[in-house]
Structures are given as C-alpha cells and as structure tokens.
C-alpha cells in the first residue's frame, strides 16, 4: 500500500491534505480519536394490560398453560405494547431486570421478529427459577427452549432453566482459529458465580452441529468442577421448541374425531 493511499484509507485524510503532507507543505497530521460510544440505558418495553395474545401464541407452539402462568407469576414473561411481543426478562441477584428478549407472535414464511432489548446485559439472561432449593441448572440456547423442555417434563420446577441467549460456534468443517468459540457462555459464568450451591449442569442445547459443538466446549470447561449431564433432543437437527410443537400437533391429530366415509 502506498503512503498516499495509507493516509487516505487508514488515517482518513483528505486527498489534498495527504498530498501536502507528503510534500512537506503542512505540519504532521495527528488523527483525532473517535469518541467511545456510550452504552444506552436498559429499559423494559411497556407492558400490555394482559398476556392473552402471547399465551395463545405459546400454546400454539406447544407450551403448556401451567408453564406460561408460572413464568408470568415470576414476572419474567409478559406481553408488550404496541406490537404484542412476548418479552422474556432476565434479572440480576437483586431481582432487578437487566435483560429482555423480544419474540414476535406473528410469523411470515415461518420466521418471526426476534431481538434483544437495547441495553440488555446478556450475562443476566432469562432464567426460570425452581420451586425449591436445587443443585442443578439446565442450560438452553433460547428462552422458548427452556419453556418447551419444562412443558415436555410435565412442568417440573426442580431446577433452574437458564437461556444462554444464543451460542458461539464455528461453521461446520471450518478450521477453528478463534478462541471466542471456546469461551464459556457469559450467562452461565455469571449464574454459577452467584449460585455456589450448584453442583450439576444439564446441557440442553440444540441437536445440530452448533449445539453439539457448544455442548462439548461446556463439557470440557466445567467437567471436574461440576457433574455434567448431556441432554440434547433425541431428534437430529431439532431443539426442544421443535419437539414441544410436534407433540402438540401429534396430540391434536390423535384427539381429532375420525371422519365418516
């Protein structure tokens, strides 16, 4: 790269200023430091007066009323305005909301709106608390997977169910170079720091390449300190949200009366 091109493309100088500098017709150029962007403050989306729409949506996805009501009662799930998104709330140890994941209830071509609320801290991700003291935490890639697995387990409240807010994994068959793929999830690290009573980690990531990769990395990192239980969905390529929805549809077909011929 030429000196002129370097000054223009890297230092951001104007062409004329760069030429003058190289010809020693102007004083040395000192690039200005860009100001650090301040992180916007976190604020929960406004609540709607009820949760009727998100309850219907989650029911359709195979999530039981019992599980939905449990989450609403713990103030970690509600319906927002004006778009009626399902809001999954993550809290810190003082029960202060520090994270929110929004999931749209209207889908187009099988895809719906999903985003983390501005200012969210992923280390305080969505977590369903147990009914009583426990030594186990189950970890999932997404909030809805936690609700789905709880539904499939008949609404058991015997462990924490923590969403990791997504996972970092390389593409299949890619050469692994970045250490970021091997870093333990922030949400799980923060949770374990604040819950020294935990002795067991149940890994419930998706049964695809990324989920299996994440499972192996967590297993390597925590094995020896914690008892590791690997509990991925039995179906290849599926997550627990898929299985809950499939079970809902299967039950619907089973309960449908036979048509007369």
Q: For each predicted feature, which ranges?
A:
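TOPRIM fold recognition
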Residues: 151-261
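Basic, glycine-enriched DNA-binding surface that flanks or lies within the catalytic cores of DNA
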Residues: 35-131
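Conserved mixed alpha/beta catalytic, RNA-binding, or beta-rich assembly cores of soluble enzyme
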Residues: 139-142, 166-168
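Helix N-cap/beta->alpha junction signal
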Residues: 141-144, 207
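Non-catalytic accessory segments of DNA primases and related replication-initiation nucleases
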Residues: 1-60, 260
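Terminal peptide-recognition signature
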Residues: 7, 58, 141, 149, ...
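Short active-site loop/helix that positions an aromatic residue
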Residues: 9, 146, 150-154
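Short active-site oxyanion
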Residues: 133-138, 199-202
